C-alpha cells in the first residue's frame, strides 16, 4: 500500500488497484498501471509467484437451455472478428502419444504438468514469475485435449507413400553433403529462420509465444493475421477464378465460403518452399473456423497430399477471444541478429583463404 501511494503521488495511474488475485500462488499483490502506447504494465509485490488458472468449466461451456447464437456482421455473415489467442492450446501435441492411446481427456493436473514441461523447456532459465506475467498463460487454463489429430482415429499421421519414402531416404543420404557444404547465400537458411513464413498449416499452430490471431472481415473477404512473423492471409468468400497454374505462393491460393456458421477455406497453389511435416507444393489444405461461444473459436484443418501420405489427416484445437488485453505489436525478428552475417562472412573468408593458398601453391610450382 505504501509503495502504491508513492506511485500515485508521482502521477502513476492504476488501471487496477493492487490486490491478491484469485488463484494467486502467494499472498503477494499485483496491480496494473497505464503505460505509453496503450500498454498495460503489471506491478507485482516481492514474493509474487503467479496465478493458477481456473480449471472449472468455461462460461461458454456451461450447459444452457438456449443454444449459442453466432453474432452477425452488418452485411449478414457470421462475425468471427476479434483478437484471438492460441495460448490455451500451447502444449497440445500434434500426434497422440503412445502412452495415451486410450485416454479421452487429460486430468487438470496432467494438463498443467504438460504445459509446465513444455514452457520451461522452451524458455530456459527465465524466472517463473516473469514467464507467468509476460507470456499470458495465467489468463487461460491449459487445454485437456490429448492431441490435435482427430482423424485417423488413432491420432497419428498416416504412413508415407513409397515415393515420399524414397525422397526421405535420398534426403538422409545427402544431408552430410549439405552439412559439409559451405554456405553460399541466405537461402541456405530456411524460410522460417529468415522470418519469411512458417507456411501452412504451421502458421496457425500455437507456440510458446506470439500466439495472437487477429481476424477482420469486410463484405466478400476475411483477413487472418498471425502474430508470429505477422503473416496475413486475405481470403475471398465470394467465388472467383483461381490463380493460374503457374502462379505459386508462400501461403497458397485460398478460396473461402460460408457453410452455415462455419468459415471454410480451401487452399492450393503452394510454392513448395515451406512444408509442414513433409508436405509438398501439391498439398490441399481445408480449414474450418467455427465460433462455439462468445470466447471460443474452433479451428479444424484437413491436410491432403497424395504425393506424401497414403491418406488425408485432420487436426483440431481452439482459440480464445482476448480483446481486452491482447494486442499485435510490431514484429521484430532479426534486428541485431548477427548469425547470418557471421555464417556468410565466415564462408567467404574461407573462400579467400583457399584462393590465396592455391595461388601461393601455383606460384611456388612455377
PLM feature segments, named:
Residues 53, 58-366:
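PEST-like low-complexity, intrinsically disordered acidic/proline/serine-rich tracts
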Residues 5-58:
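Vicinal oxygen chelate
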Amino acid at each position: 500500500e505504501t509503495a502504491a501511494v508513492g506511485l500515485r503521488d508521482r502521477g502513476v495511474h492504476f488501471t487496477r488497484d493492487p490486490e491478491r488475485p484469485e488463484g494467486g500462488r502467494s499472498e503477494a499483490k499485483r496491480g496494473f498501471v497505464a503505460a505509453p502506447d496503450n500498454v498495460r504494465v503489471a506491478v507485482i509485490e516481492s514474493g509474487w509467484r503467479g496465478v493458477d488458472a481456473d480449471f472449472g468449466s468455461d462460461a461458454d461451456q456451461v450447459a444452457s437451455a438456449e443454444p449459442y447464437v453466432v453474432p452477425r456482421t452488418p452485411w449478414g455473415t457470421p462475425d468471427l472478428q476479434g483478437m484471438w489467442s492460441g495460448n490455451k492450446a500451447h502444449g497440445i501435441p500434434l500426434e497422440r502419444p503412445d502412452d495415451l492411446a486410450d485416454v479421452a481427456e487429460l486430468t487438470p493436473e496432467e494438463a498443467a504438468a504438460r504445459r509446465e514441461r513444455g514452457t520451461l523447456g522452451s524458455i530456459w532459465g527465465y524466472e517463473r514469475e516473469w514467464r507467468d506475467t509476460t507470456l499470458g498463460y495465467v489468463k487461460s487454463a491449459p487445454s485437456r485435449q490429448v492431441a490435435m489429430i482427430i482423424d485417423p482415429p488413432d491420432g497419428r499421421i498416416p504412413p508415407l507413400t513409397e515415393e515420399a519414402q524414397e525422397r526421405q531416404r535420398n534426403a538422409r543420404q545427402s544431408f552430410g553433403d549439405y552439412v559439409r557444404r559451405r554456405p553460399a547465400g541466405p537461402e541456405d537458411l530456411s524460410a522460417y529462420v529468415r522470418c519469411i513464413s512458417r507456411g501452412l498449416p504451421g502458421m496457425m499452430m500455437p507456440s510458446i509465444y506470439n500466439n495472437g490471431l487477429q481476424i477482420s472481415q469486410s463484405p466478400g473477404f476475411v483477413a487472418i493475421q498471425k502474430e508470429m512473423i505477422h503473416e496475413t492471409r486475405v481470403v475471398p468468400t465470394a467465388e472467383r477464378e483461381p490463380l493460374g497454374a503457374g502462379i505459386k505462393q508462400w501461403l497458397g491460393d485460398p478460396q473461402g465460403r460460408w457453410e452455415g456458421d462455419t468459415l471454410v477455406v480451401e487452399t492450393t497453389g503452394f510454392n513448395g518452399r515451406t512444408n509442414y511435416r513433409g508436405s509438398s507444393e501439391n498439398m490441399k489444405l481445408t480449414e474450418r473456423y467455427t465460433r462455439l461461444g462468445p470466447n471460443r473459436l474452433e479451428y479444424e484443418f484437413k491436410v491432403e497430399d497424395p504425393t506424401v501420405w497414403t491418406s488425408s489427416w485432420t487436426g483440431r484445437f481452439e482459440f480464445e477471444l482476448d480483446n481486452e488485453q491482447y494486442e499485435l505489436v510490431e514484429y521484430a525478428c532479426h534486428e541485431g541478429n548477427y548469425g547470418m552475417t557471421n555464417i556468410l562472412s565466415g564462408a567467404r573468408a574461407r573462400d579467400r583463404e583457399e584462393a590465396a593458398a592455391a595461388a601461393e601453391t601455383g606460384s611456388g610450382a612455377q
